[in-house]
Amino acid sequence: MRPASLDEAAALLSAASAEGTAVRIGEDLSTAALDRVLEHEAGDLTCTVEAGIRLSALRAALAERGQRLSLDPPGDPTVGACLAARLSGPLSHRFGTPRDLVLGVTLVLGDGTIASAGGKVVKNVAGYDLGKLVCGSEGRLALIARVSLRLHPLPQASSTIVVETDNPAGVVRALRSSVLQPSALDVLVPGRVAVLFEGSPGAVAAQLDSARALVGGVEADDGVWEEARERQGRALGRLAFAPGDLGNVLSTLDEAVVRPAAGVAYVPRRVGGVPDAAARQIQRRLKERFDPAGILV
């Protein structure tokens, strides 16, 4: 199934529901043909897109107006996949994950019902926050069909430093307790802390000088961020931790990309763990509410 419109997607899921046919979003039903920029309100720093648009295409369209979606996960996923799988990259340090950038969504439920919530402006507070709810849902609650997103201006300048250290937790602590405002801050285990500054040329130069005076380091090119995303992309596990546990977590890792602000480490091994009873109950209730027939699997 490859719907080319919202109504066609709704009709396909309605038919599948009537037949009792299970559907896997992304496999049985592709959003590849739902790939348009529907609106770009540059003055409001927002856009509305179909969920099948790939980040590379959206970046190119937004760049024409000097703006960007501050989301940089590995590869070139669709916007819908970024929400459904909670995909983000180094820029999440300053700009957050998809749930922080989504303003509104249009969904198609398993029975073909179309549901919209949120809005196109940053101050909208009406309705249920379905946008945040479907982040990380893996396509099991609804098809994400359209998304309204918060944007940011393209930075005029950027610069990266890399600090080689035996105490990455100390470097991170010093940076995060300072007045510096990096756009990205990753620990590449073992022994490197990468820091990205963006903004006007003068502001970037000033922050770069302050950072080097505080923690040392040398300037580096964007290759370090490509490495961080590549290592994240091939990681087999995602380890969550409390910010205060950074030092303890780093001491247990031989190789990883660690995002201290998000409290997550991408590691080259599978990470066990089962949701607790309360979390499983919430998941079950959400599934019963949004897809009681169990069409979306």
Predicted regions and their residues:
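Glycine-rich N-terminal segment of FAD-binding domains in flavoprotein oxidoreductases
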Residues: 1-73, 268-270
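Conserved glycine-rich FAD pyrophosphate-binding loop
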Residues: 32, 73, 190, 214-297
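A short linear hydrophobic-aromatic micro-motif
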Residues: 22, 181-186, 254-258
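General beta-strand structural signal in soluble alpha/beta enzymes
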Residues: 2-3, 23-31, 49-51, 68-74, ...
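FAD-binding subdomain of flavoenzyme oxidoreductases
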Residues: 55, 71-181
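A conserved active-site cap/scaffold subdomain adjacent to cofactor or substrate pockets
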Residues: 158-219
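Short amphipathic alpha-helices in soluble, non-transmembrane regions
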Residues: 16, 62, 171-178, 205-216, ...
